[in-house]
C-alpha cells in the first residue's frame, strides 16, 4: 500500500505544476491517506495500447472520463486515483495522465469493506465504482479491486503535463517503481533464507543437521548467492536513478528481474527444505512462497523487463 501511494503520487511530483502539487500532494503530507495508481485494464495488461478507458472533451472545456481498471491496489480505501487513459476515443494513440480526487478520508476511518463494493458519488459529477476486493493467492493483506469511472468530470488542471504525453510520464515513473518492487522481492528472499537457515540448523535427519547434508548445503549456498546478487543489482539501480543516468531504466528492470528471481527461488527452495512442514500454514515459509509469485508479475512481467533491457543494450 505504501509503495502504491508513492507510485500514484510521484508522477505528480515529477511532472505536475506547483499548483497541482499543492492541491494533490499536500493532503497526503497532512493525513495518512491512500492513493491508487490505475493502469491495468481487463483487456490491457502488459500491452497498454489495448486500453479502452478514455477522456472525451466537453463543450465547456472540461472532459469526461469513462472506463474500467483492474487489479488496483488500495482501491477500496483510496482518497485519490491517478489514471492513465486514452484521449478523445478508445482507439486514440495518445494517452493522458489524470488525477481524480475522491474522498479525503483516512483509511482507518473507513469501515472494513471485507468483500463489499464501494461507490463514490463525486460532487463535480460522475461516480467511481470500486468492485469486490480480489481473493488473491498471496499478499492477501494488500487490498486489490477493480475500479470503474462512470462519466467522471475532469477539469484541465487535473491533467498532468501535456495531455498527449501521459504514457511517457507513466513509463518514467515505473523506473522508480521497479526498484521498490525489487526491494520487496529482496526482503522476501532474505526472510526465506533466514527462516530456512534456522530450520535446517535445528532439524536433524540421517544423524546430522539438515544444513550439514551436502545436497541441502548446496541449496542454501545457491539461495545465499541469489540474495547477494539481487541486493547488488538493487543498490546499483538506486544509484543510477539518484544520478538520473540515462540508462537507469535498464538497471531498474535488471533489479526487478533479479530480485523477483531471488524471491521465487528462495521461497520455493526454502519450502522444499522445510519438507512437509513447509506446506502447512503454521510455517511462515508457506506464506512467502505464495507472496513471491506476484513479484515476478506486477510492475512488468520478467519478459517485459527483458524486452526493455534487450532494446537498450542492442
Q: Can you say where each PLM-predicted feature lies in the sequence?
A:
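Alpha-helical interface subdomain recognition
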Residues: 2, 7, 15-20, 30-31, ...
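Short beta-alpha junctions and helix-cap segments that line functional grooves
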Residues: 24, 50-51, 68-70, 132-135
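A short, Trp-centered hydrophobic/proline-enriched beta-strand micro-motif
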Residues: 31-39
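Conserved hydrophobic/aromatic beta-strand scaffold that supports enzyme active sites
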Residues: 36, 52-54, 80-84, 97-99, ...
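Short Gly/Pro-enriched turn/cap motifs at secondary-structure boundaries
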Residues: 43-46, 71-74, 86-89, 136-143
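Active-site-adjacent elements of ketosynthase-type condensing enzymes
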Residues: 43-52, 122
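A short core secondary-structure module
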Residues: 62, 66-129
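Long, acidic (Asp/Glu-rich), low-complexity accessory segments flanking structured domains
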Residues: 150-168
Amino acid at each position: 500500500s505504501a509503495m502504491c501511494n508513492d507510485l500514484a503520487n510521484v508522477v505528480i511530483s515529477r511532472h505536475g505544476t506547483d499548483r497541482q502539487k499543492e492541491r494533490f500532494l499536500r493532503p497526503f503530507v497532512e493525513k495518512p491517506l491512500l492513493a491508487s495508481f490505475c493502469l491495468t485494464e481487463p483487456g490491457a495488461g502488459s500491452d497498454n495500447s489495448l486500453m479502452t478507458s478514455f477522456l472525451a472533451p466537453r463543450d465547456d472545456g472540461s472532459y469526461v472520463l469513462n472506463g474500467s481498471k483492474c487489479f488496483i491496489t488500495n482501491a477500496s480505501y483510496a482518497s485519490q486515483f491517478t489514471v492513465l487513459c486514452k484521449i478523445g476515443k478508445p482507439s486514440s494513440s495518445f494517452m493522458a495522465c489524470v488525477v481524480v480526487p475522491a474522498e479525503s478520508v483516512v483509511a482507518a476511518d473507513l469501515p472494513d469493506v471485507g468483500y463489499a463494493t464501494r461507490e463514490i458519488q463525486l460532487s463535480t459529477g460522475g461516480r467511481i465504482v470500486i468492485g469486490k476486493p480480489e481473493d488473491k493467492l498471496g499478499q492477501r493483506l494488500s487490498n486489490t479491486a477493480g475500479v470503474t469511472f462512470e462519466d467522471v468530470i475532469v477539469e484541465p488542471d487535473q491533467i498532468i503535463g501535456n495531455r498527449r504525453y501521459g504514457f511517457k510520464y507513466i513509463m518514467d515513473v515505473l523506473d522508480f517503481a521497479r526498484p521498490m518492487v525489487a526491494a520487496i522481492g529482496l526482503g522476501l528472499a532474505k526472510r526465506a533464507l533466514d527462516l530456512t537457515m534456522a530450520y535446517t540448523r535445528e532439524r536433524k535427519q540421517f544423524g546430522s543437521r539438515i544444513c550439514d547434508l551436502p545436497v541441502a548445503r548446496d541449496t542454501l549456498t545457491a539461495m545465499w548467492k541469489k540474495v547477494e546478487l539481487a541486493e547488488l543489482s538493487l543498490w546499483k539501480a538506486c544509484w543510477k536513478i539518484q544520478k538520473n543516468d540515462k540508462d537507469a531504466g535498464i538497471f531498474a528492470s535488471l533489479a526487478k528481474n533479479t530480485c523477483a528471481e531471488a524471491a521465487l527461488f528462495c521461497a520455493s527452495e526454502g519450502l522444499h527444505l522445510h519438507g512437509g512442514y513447509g506446506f502447512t500454514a503454521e510455517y511462515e515459509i508457506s506464506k512467502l512462497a505464495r507472496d513471491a509469485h506476484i513479484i515476478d508479475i506486477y510492475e512488468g512481467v520478467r519478459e517485459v523487463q527483458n524486452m526493455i533491457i534487450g532494446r537498450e543494450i542492442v
